[in-house]
């Protein structure tokens, strides 16, 4: 019985620690057009990261998260080559071609490195991103956010992408975008 009393608080501590450590994305700014009254019906998801594999993993994961919430979405990589993901005219043409009313663009805006001291000193890497959501019917920006995501070196990059996508979708839901 004594072992149970000692191990229960420890188990609760571990659960809380794991829950907190899973949320590695912090949103530093978020702006939403309060006059926007619509709800996206079909979203074109564009990831402007330079690495083609990361672009595809991100877009696939984002579309999956949206579809799990019954929101129609499509990836851009199947019909937009990597170099044109930052070309506004190409994006508008692609949006029209695939029949979307909303475009979500995720792009890197920099990295930050911070030293953490403990028993040993190590560096934490943070990727800073910008998420912009456009209403294609009115051709205007309806949401813009910047985020910072902690990248642990011992965790595979696709796991970071999945966690980041969940955090972004959750934040967009909280903002009433979907």
Tell what function each PLM region has.
Residues 1-22:
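Sec-dependent bacterial lipoprotein signal peptides
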Residues 11-14, 37, 65, 123:
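A generic structural signal for short, solvent-exposed coil/turn residues
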Residues 21-80, 90-100, 174-178:
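A structural "domain/chain start" motif
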Residues 23-42, 121-128, 132-178:
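C-terminal/domain-edge helix-coil "capping" segments
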Residues 49-60, 82-89, 128, 154-163:
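Soluble non-cytosolic domains of exported or imported proteins
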Residues 50-53, 79-83, 109-113, 148-152:
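Solvent-exposed loop/turn segments at secondary-structure junctions
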Residues 86-140:
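Surface-exposed short loop/turn segments
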């Amino acid at each position: 019985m004594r072992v149970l009393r000692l191990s229960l608080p420890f188990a609760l501590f571990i659960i809380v620690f794991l829950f907190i450590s899973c949320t590695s994305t912090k949103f530093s700014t978020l702006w939403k057009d309060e006059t926007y009254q619509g709800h996206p019906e079909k979203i074109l998801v564009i990831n402007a990261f330079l690495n083609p594999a990361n672009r595809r993993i991100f877009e696939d994961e984002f579309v999956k998260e949206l579809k799990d919430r019954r929101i129609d979405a499509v990836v851009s990589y199947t019909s937009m080559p990597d170099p044109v993901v930052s070309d506004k005219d190409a994006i508008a043409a692609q949006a029209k071609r695939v029949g979307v009313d909303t475009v979500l663009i995720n792009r890197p805006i920099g990295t930050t490195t911070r030293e953490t001291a403990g028993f040993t000193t190590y560096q934490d890497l943070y990727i800073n991103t910008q998420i912009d959501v456009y209403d294609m019917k009115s051709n205007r920006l309806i949401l813009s956010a910047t985020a910072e995501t902690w990248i642990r070196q011992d965790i595979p990059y696709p796991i970071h992408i999945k966690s980041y996508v969940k955090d972004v979708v959750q934040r967009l839901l909280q903002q009433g975008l979907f």
